[in-house]
Design a protein with these regions (language model features):
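Bacterial Sec-dependent N-terminal signal peptides
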Residues: 1-34
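Charged, low-complexity intrinsically disordered terminal segments
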Residues: 28-272
């Protein structure tokens, strides 16, 4: 979910984008992990703003000088996302509740396979329950074929008997991070009905956000935390967290990212 709030300051308006991530198994984060990234002290915002004070008290990170572009439809999202993927040089990370096995997913996977051939690292993660509950799920044969093409793809928290394990703690995140510099987050999974709509409801209305700037590092850290726990890998390092100068997006937007960690941060989610 995305919450846009504005807080008035003496010298003008100060905008915040608060991104709320839901999902995960009960004890996935029994201990806090650090991937290889923490913002410099200069990222701390000093203000008498009630919003900023709350975020600080709740230990919710806020970064400055970000560029934000609101994507108000499925077509806008996928056009923008695919265009950025084509320009990727080092890595593409995707985390979704589900990848519906339809035309838009096929287009995405074809593009990702092409980038893998160019040497770009491709990592994709989806929720096992989200895939199982999908009317057009990815099957083992699909995953095997994607891996042959150089796409690392795994499902989070596989379903086990009696098939309701952690049913209320699923991974509902929708995150894409490209080269550690551009990120996408919002309400849309990978499915063609975000563009075509559905017969029973008509046009599908949802939104997504493209982010450039230091906030992408937090989304990268969130992705790599669950990726490393799921795959037992240890992906980290400066290649995934490129350094931004303090003037990259001068006078850009400030972004607060709230990540739901079960048994650790549910209070943050409720209050935010």
């Amino acid at each position: 979910r995305i919450i846009l709030t504005a807080d008035y300051l003496k010298k003008g308006f100060f905008f915040f984008l608060t991104i709320i991530m839901f999902g995960f198994v009960n004890n996935l984060y029994a201990q806090q992990d650090t991937i290889f990234f923490h913002s410099k002290p200069s990222d701390t915002i000093t203000s008498d703003s009630a919003v900023i004070q709350f975020l600080s008290d709740a230990d919710i990170p806020v970064t400055t000088d970000n560029k934000i572009h609101l994507l108000k439809s499925g077509k806008e999202k996928f056009d923008d996302l695919f265009s950025t993927i084509k320009k990727a040089k080092h890595h593409i990370h995707l985390e979704y509740f589900n990848f519906r096995n339809d035309s838009i997913a096929n287009e995405l996977f074809t593009l990702l396979a092409h980038k893998a051939q160019e040497g770009v690292e491709i990592r994709a993660l989806f929720d096992a329950f989200g895939n199982w509950s999908n009317s057009r799920p990815l099957k083992k044969k699909h995953l095997k074929n994607l891996r042959k093409k150089g796409i690392e793809i795994y499902h989070f928290d596989p379903l086990r008997f009696p098939y309701i394990n952690h049913v209320f703690h699923r991974d509902h995140r929708k995150i894409v991070v490209i080269d550690g510099t551009i990120a996408y987050v919002g309400g849309m999974n990978i499915a063609d009905y975000y563009i075509k709509g559905l017969p029973e409801i008509g046009e599908w209305r949802d939104m997504h956000v493209r982010i450039e700037g230091k906030a992408t590092h937090y989304l990268q850290e969130i992705f790599l935390s669950i990726w490393n726990k799921t795959t037992k890998q240890n992906i980290s390092g400066t290649a995934y967290f490129p350094i931004y100068s303090d003037t990259t997006f001068h006078k850009g937007k400030s972004i607060a990212i709230v990540d739901r960690t079960p048994k650790k941060t549910p209070k943050q989610i409720r209050q935010t």
